[in-house]
Amino acid sequence: MNSTTSPYRVIAVCTGNICRSPMAELMLSAAFAEAGLADAVIVDSAGTTAYEAGRPIDPRAARKLTAHNLFSDRHIAREWQSEWFTERHLILALDVDHYGWLRASAPDEESLSRIRMLRSFDPDLEDGDPLEQGIEDPWYGGHADFDAVWDQVQAAVPGIVRYVQDAIAQDARVADRNGAGTVAAPAR
């Protein structure tokens, strides 16, 4: 990427934006930084509902993240905004209901092409049915449920990083050919 290229935007989406999606956001942000892409990729998160909007991350999620030196003290839950369909390059649904909601809400085919189940990047599930790729809401459970979310997201992180690296490289080649300086939606 060159200095005139816009960052690649990734968003993780769950229900209330206080457990799964902020965990994924921080885990992915750390992975992109470790891959040398901190300035090239912006990761954020949102919920499909406004139930938790304005609230901090669930303390159990925060504890799990802190145990891995990821700090969520600045996170404030927010609801999905429809303009993000065009402003995000990769939209990661954390569970099947989020995937269905996002697909039903998408305004066009290009937006639909940006929506993926987060766990579709897990090599053990990548060829599976999206209905089998969900991450259950840990909110109703205990610490073991937050451990499971961590493990499930972590299994997909390397695949997401590779996917974004490939998309950035492809977009840089297109931009170089066209003399442009923006990141396009990833080719499918």
Per-segment meaning from a language model:
Residues 2-87, 165-172, 178-184, 188:
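Conserved active-site segments centered on acidic
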Residues 21, 95-96:
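Helix N-cap/beta->alpha junction signal
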Residues 90, 96-188:
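Phosphate-binding/catalytic loops
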